[in-house]
């Protein structure tokens, strides 16, 4: 008999219904559940798949470079980054009529093109790329790396090259190599690139393989390094009149602490960034030599953890048992990695707009909006994933005997206190925030806007003032002009930083008021509720008050009637499913807030945000409705324009989103009956009944339908907002 899909589970392959296909797809990556899996093969499969992941990433980035070099306008854009629109790639579409061809022929192109809102042009320009040839070279190099990764993945599945389990579990060695290799050496290499290529390029000097050995990055070469006169590298920085990419107003410094932004590009000083990466490199190179491996020197992580017994016995046996628990659980490790990566991705979103690193990106408003939104959504998905794998850890890998009375066991012991604490915090935030918004709504509806409850965020304003923002008049710490810290700041550290905070041309420490106070608490509500659902899902994964015997029912049991008190929505899977809706909801509020506040800043009508953001009707009317006018106008009696594609995507996003509800709000029995009816009709229809199928069609399980519904809801939600964001921003600012 020919092997049927899925080959990794012969039990499932025997299933006579369409469940075989769906469950096969669902468990394809759950290596732990596959037939004949051993711990060694599990680790080797995951290791090999990492190489495949890298190959895909390199191929994708190579494609970006290649298409811009082939179909973009990089060399033209460099001549005038503020007015030429960067082209991502050409569009070839046989359906385009003349109006469409005209609408999408932009940026000096000969035919229809897509505009780039990813910031790659600004990034490549900042790091020293200047010609299409540079882009092609980069694309080829990344293609080579992609091939190398694929070969590496294949190689590490061959018998002679398969790593052993002991190698995967050597935590100290892995930590040393990741700290000093991934972070240390790569940061050092990046410093080298910035100093040898990017900084000279910003001063009009073109350094490539043919001349990089005879162009000194600094007039004094390595002299100051070896004589200990490191401060020489910071002397004579670029002046405030420096024209980026030319020698006009440029200096010779390579490692500085200027602070603030380059006046022309509105981005951080390249010499500050080189200095930053050098410091990071040194820190991580030291950190990467701290853990004990072959030589018996350095820290043992197990010893470190076991020494962590808090005084007074308030946390029981502290971190005892954690080393083996974490080191033997891939899900725990993945949970930690995802939690860290999620936080970092959100921080990237926050810092890319407030401290722009790439030349001229701050003046490309649509790109700023797109990058912020993109990174916040990615962060949301990654963070929810962290808790999902935390829940799987408790089900598959947690051993109560091994963790007796340590910090992990104590989390489980008082989980009810944790869950109820999050619960009352969420309820408090929700009712009070909504109460304020609704009160203000009613006051405006009755024409008595002066009766709104408007709360000044004085604590946040005080914190901003302490960091140097003077406009609130608090006169405290760095905003106090006669304080020692302020005066030291003028000369010793980051002299440009305080100026940047008080300039109104950037997004540092934006002025905040009652509207910000309210939306801040709405976002806090979203964050706490999402966290509540996720934490409860993980802590109750093996058993809860309602159903103490969960661990015998696997990871994703369906709704099981009222027998054990009803098991709907109480599996770890269900918690994840519900949390994703709240995550999307929260990030919706975050991105609405960011976008509206910035649109009014960029347009110079900040009072619109300040006055309309204190009541819900203001958000609905003056943000959502007002800014969707371009989308509703994508197609009109006068033909089409360059926003038509976003108008279409806006509609299509709503369609996908609405389709999600067909799976989310329905009864499984209804679908089963519908399927049976269709199958019956098919089998009795001449000609049609010549087509047969082997698998008996059955309705999706409850968990499957929820997944399909959630996927449509998420994709539709993001498509809709992406179209809204890009069209409303590019429609205003070009």
From Swiss-Prot:
Keyword entries, A-Z: 4Fe-4S, Chlorophyll, Chloroplast, Chromophore, Electron transport, Iron, Iron-sulfur, Magnesium, Membrane, Metal-binding, Oxidoreductase, Photosynthesis, Photosystem I, Plastid, Thylakoid, Transmembrane, Transmembrane helix, Transport
Catalytic activity annotation: reduced [plastocyanin] + hnu + oxidized [2Fe-2S]-[ferredoxin] = oxidized [plastocyanin] + reduced [2Fe-2S]-[ferredoxin]
Cofactor comment: P700 is a chlorophyll a/chlorophyll a' dimer, A0 is one or more chlorophyll a, A1 is one or both phylloquinones and FX is a shared 4Fe-4S iron-sulfur center.
This protein's record includes keyword Transport: yes
Transmembrane segments: 46-69, 135-158, 175-199, 273-291, 330-353, 369-395, 417-439, 517-535, 575-596, 643-665, 707-727
One Gene Ontology molecular-function label: magnesium ion binding
Record EC number: 1.97.1.12
Subcellular location per the Swiss-Prot or TrEMBL entry: Plastid, Chloroplast thylakoid membrane
UniProt family annotation: Belongs to the PsaA/PsaB family.
Role noted for this protein: PsaA and PsaB bind P700, the primary electron donor of photosystem I (PSI), as well as the electron acceptors A0, A1 and FX. PSI is a plastocyanin-ferredoxin oxidoreductase, converting photonic excitation into a charge separation, which transfers an electron from the donor P700 chlorophyll pair to the spectroscopically characterized acceptors A0, A1, FX, FA and FB in turn. Oxidized P700 is reduced on the lumenal side of the thylakoid membrane by plastocyanin.
UniProt-recorded name of the protein: Photosystem I P700 chlorophyll a apoprotein A2
Organism: Draba nemorosa
Encoding gene, per UniProt annotation: psaB
């Amino acid at each position: 008999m020919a092997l049927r899909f899925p080959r990794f589970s012969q039990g499932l392959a025997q299933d006579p219904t369409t469940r075989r296909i769906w469950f096969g797809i669902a468990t394809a990556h759950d290596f732990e559940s596959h037939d004949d899996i051993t711990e060694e093969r599990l680790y080797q499969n995951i290791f090999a798949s990492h190489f495949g992941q890298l190959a895909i990433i390199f191929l994708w980035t190579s494609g970006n470079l290649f298409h811009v070099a082939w179909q973009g306008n990089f060399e033209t854009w460099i001549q005038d980054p503020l007015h030429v629109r960067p082209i991502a790639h050409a569009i070839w579409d046989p359906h385009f009529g003349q109006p469409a061809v005209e609408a999408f022929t932009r940026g000096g192109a000969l035919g229809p093109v897509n505009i780039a809102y990813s910031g790659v042009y600004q990034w490549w320009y900042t790091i020293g790329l200047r010609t299409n040839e540079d882009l092609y070279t980069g694309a080829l190099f990344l293609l080579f790396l992609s091939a190398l990764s694929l070969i590496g993945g294949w190689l590490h599945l061959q018998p002679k090259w398969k790593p052993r389990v002991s190698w995967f579990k050597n935590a100290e060695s892995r930590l040393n190599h990741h700290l000093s290799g991934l972070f240390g050496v790569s940061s050092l290499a990046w410093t080298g690139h910035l100093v040898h290529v990017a900084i000279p390029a910003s001063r009009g000097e073109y350094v490539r393989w043919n001349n990089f050995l005879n162009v000194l990055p600094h007039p004094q070469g390595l002299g100051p390094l070896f004589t200990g006169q490191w401060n020489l590298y910071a002397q004579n920085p670029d002046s405030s009149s420096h024209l980026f990419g030319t020698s006009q107003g440029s200096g010779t410094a390579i490692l500085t602490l200027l602070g603030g932004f380059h006046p022309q590009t509105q981005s951080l000083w390249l010499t500050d960034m080189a200095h930053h990466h050098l410091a990071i490199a040194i820190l991580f190179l030291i950190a990467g030599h701290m853990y004990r491996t072959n030589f018996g020197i350095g820290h043992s992580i197990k010893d470190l953890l076991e020494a962590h017994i808090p005084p007074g016995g308030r946390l029981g046996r502290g971190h005892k048992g954690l080393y083996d628990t974490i080191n033997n659980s891939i899900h725990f490790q993945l949970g930690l990695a995802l939690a860290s990566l999620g936080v970092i991705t959100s921080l990237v979103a926050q810092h890319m707009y407030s401290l722009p690193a790439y030349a001229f990106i701050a003046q490309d408003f649509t790109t700023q909006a797109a990058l912020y939104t993109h990174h916040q959504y990615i962060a949301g998905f990654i963070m929810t994933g962290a808790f999902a794998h935390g829940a799987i850890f408790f089900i598959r890998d947690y051993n109560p005997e091994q963790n007796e009375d340590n910090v992990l066991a104590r989390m489980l012991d008082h989980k009810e206190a944790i869950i109820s604490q999050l619960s009352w915090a969420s309820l408090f935030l929700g009712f009070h925030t909504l109460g304020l918004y609704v009160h203000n709504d009613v006051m405006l509806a009755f024409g008595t806007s002066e009766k709104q409850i408007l709360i000044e965020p004085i604590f946040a304003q005080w914190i901003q003032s302490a960091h140097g923002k003077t406009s609130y008049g608090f006169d405290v710490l760095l905003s106090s002009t006669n304080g020692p810290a302020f005066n030291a700041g003028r000369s010793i550290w980051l002299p440009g930083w305080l100026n940047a905070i008080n300039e109104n041309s950037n997004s540092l420490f934006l002025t905040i008021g009652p509207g910000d106070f309210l939306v801040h608490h709405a976002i806090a509500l979203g964050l706490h509720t999402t966290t509540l659902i996720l934490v409860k899902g993980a802590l109750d994964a093996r058993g809860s008050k309602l159903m103490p015997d969960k661990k015998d029912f696997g990871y994703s049991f369906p709704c099981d009637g009222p027998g054990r008190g009803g098991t709907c929505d109480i599996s770890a899977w269900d918690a994840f499913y519900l949390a994703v809706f709240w995550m999307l909801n929260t990030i919706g509020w975050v991105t609405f807030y960011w976008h509206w506040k910035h649109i009014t800043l960029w347009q110079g009508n900040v009072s619109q945000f300040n006055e309309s953001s204190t009541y819900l009707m203001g958000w609905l009317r003056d943000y959502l409705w007002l800014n969707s006018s371009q989308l509703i106008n994508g197609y009109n009696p006068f033909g089409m324009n360059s926003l038509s594609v976003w108008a279409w995507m806006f509609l299509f996003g709503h369609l996908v989103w609405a389709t999600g509800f067909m799976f989310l709000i329905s009864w499984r029995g209804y679908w089963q009956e519908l399927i049976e009816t269709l199958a019956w009709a098919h089998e009795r229809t001449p000609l049609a009944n010549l087509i047969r199928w082997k698998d008996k069609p059955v309705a999706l399980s409850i968990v499957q339908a929820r997944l399909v519904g959630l996927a449509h809801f998420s994709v539709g939600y993001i498509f809709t907002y992406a179209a809204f964001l890009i069209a409303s921003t590019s429609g205003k600012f070009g």
